Structures are given as C-alpha cells and as structure tokens.
C-alpha cells in the first residue's frame, strides 16, 4: 500500500 505513514513496505509506503 502507499498511505504515507507506517512501515515503508509492510503497510505504509512513507517513513513518517
């Protein structure tokens, strides 16, 4: 997914 927050490849997409 690509949400912008959370883990960078598990569920987030961004590192914020």
From Swiss-Prot:
Which locations, inside or outside the cell, does it occupy? Answer: Secreted
Query: Per the record, what is one GO cellular component?
Result: extracellular region
Q: Name one GO biological process term.
A: adaptive immune response
Q: Does the keyword Disulfide bond apply?
A: yes
Q: What keywords sit in the KW lines?
A: Adaptive immunity, Blood coagulation, Coiled coil, Disulfide bond, Hemostasis, Immunity, Innate immunity, Secreted
Stretches that traverse the bilayer: none
PTM notes: Conversion of fibrinogen to fibrin is triggered by thrombin, which cleaves fibrinopeptides A and B from alpha and beta chains, and thus exposes the N-terminal polymerization sites responsible for the formation of the soft clot. The soft clot is converted into the hard clot by factor XIIIA which catalyzes the epsilon-(gamma-glutamyl)lysine cross-linking between gamma chains (stronger) and between alpha chains (weaker) of different monomers. Forms F13A-mediated cross-links between a glutamine and the epsilon-amino group of a lysine residue, forming fibronectin-fibrinogen heteropolymers.
Major localization class: secreted
* Domain commentary: A long coiled coil structure formed by 3 polypeptide chains connects the central nodule to the C-terminal domains (distal nodules). The long C-terminal ends of the alpha chains fold back, contributing a fourth strand to the coiled coil structure.
| Physiological role | Cleaved by the protease thrombin to yield monomers which, together with fibrinogen beta (FGB) and fibrinogen gamma (FGG), polymerize to form an insoluble fibrin matrix. Fibrin has a major function in hemostasis as one of the primary components of blood clots. In addition, functions during the early stages of wound repair to stabilize the lesion and guide cell migration during re-epithelialization. Was originally thought to be essential for platelet aggregation, based on in vitro studies using anticoagulated blood.
What does the subunit comment say? Heterohexamer; disulfide linked. Contains 2 sets of 3 non-identical chains (alpha, beta and gamma). The 2 heterotrimers are in head to head conformation with the N-termini in a small central domain.
What is the protein's given name? Fibrinogen alpha chain
């Amino acid at each position: 997914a690509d949400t912008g927050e959370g883990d960078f490849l598990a569920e987030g997409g961004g590192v914020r």
